[in-house]
């Protein structure tokens, strides 16, 4: 770079080792897990998620087929997949897929909004420090909070009383907006998954710089 009179990098990210069963992967040991095999079995985004999530900034990462399957089932299928499916199913069942903001709010809504706002700031902070695993964990913590929000607001109970119709709409609106913002944050890590979420929710794709919840 100096010979070409090009600027030198101001920081270099040196990632840790990726271990298989506690040992460094080696062809001679026959313990290598190939990315192509993971992609064939789980897809590109799931492979991205595992590698990013399991390689913290300062520690060696550990990979086993058992752990890959566990992450796929627990994080991608259960936490994220079920959240999106539940939200879409309820929106379709109760409002034909079209939810709106009604202004019938509760304290739990403000807590969810605070988590959404805090997640965007946390992701930015972690990425500035090259802590990619922490950043993606923060996004999934938001999805966990959304799942908890469903349990707290019990939309299926609200649906039984016509008087709670507007409250039900507000709950599903908050969920849809929060998941959409979460998908926007996720896009840098799992682009295909994020786009699928936005398309399934039938919402407008959001840019990273505009990931905020409406105040009115």
Annotated model-derived regions:
Residues 84-123, 147-164:
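Conserved, charged catalytic cores of large soluble enzymes
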Residues 209-215:
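Conserved small/polar residues in nucleotide/adenosyl-binding loops
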Residues 11-14, 198-200:
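Beta-strand segments within the central parallel beta-sheet cores of soluble alpha/beta enzyme folds
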Residues 2-10, 129, 189:
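Secondary-structure transition/capping motifs at alpha-helix termini
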Residues 120-133:
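Long, non-coiled-coil amphipathic alpha-helical linker/lever segments
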Residues 160-208:
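C-terminal, helix-dominated tail/subdomain
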Residues 16-107, 204-208:
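Catalytic adenosine-cofactor/nucleotide-binding cores of aminoacyl-tRNA synthetases and other
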């Amino acid at each position: 770079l100096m010979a070409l009179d090009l600027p030198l990098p101001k920081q270099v990210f040196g990632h840790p080792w990726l271990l298989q069963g506690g040992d460094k992967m080696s062809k001679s040991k026959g313990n290598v897990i190939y990315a192509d095999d993971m992609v064939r079995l789980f897809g590109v985004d799931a492979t991205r998620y595992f590698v990013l999530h399991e390689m913290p900034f300062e520690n060696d990462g550990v990979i086993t087929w058992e752990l890959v399957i566990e992450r796929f089932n627990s994080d991608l299928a259960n936490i994220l997949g079920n959240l999106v499916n539940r939200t879409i199913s309820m929106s379709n069942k109760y409002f034909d897929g079209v939810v709106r903001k009604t202004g019938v709010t509760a304290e739990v809504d403000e807590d969810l909004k605070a988590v959404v706002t805090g997640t965007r700031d946390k992701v930015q902070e972690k990425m500035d420090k090259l802590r990619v695993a922490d950043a993606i964990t923060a996004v999934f913590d938001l999805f966990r909070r959304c799942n908890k929000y469903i349990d707290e607001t019990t939309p299926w109970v609200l649906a039984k009383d016509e008087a709670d119709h507007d409250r039900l709409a507000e709950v599903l609106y908050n969920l849809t907006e929060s998941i959409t913002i979460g998908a926007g944050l996720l896009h840098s890590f799992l682009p295909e998954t994020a786009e699928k979420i936005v398309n399934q929710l039938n919402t407008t794709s959001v840019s990273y710089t505009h990931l905020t919840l409406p105040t009115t």
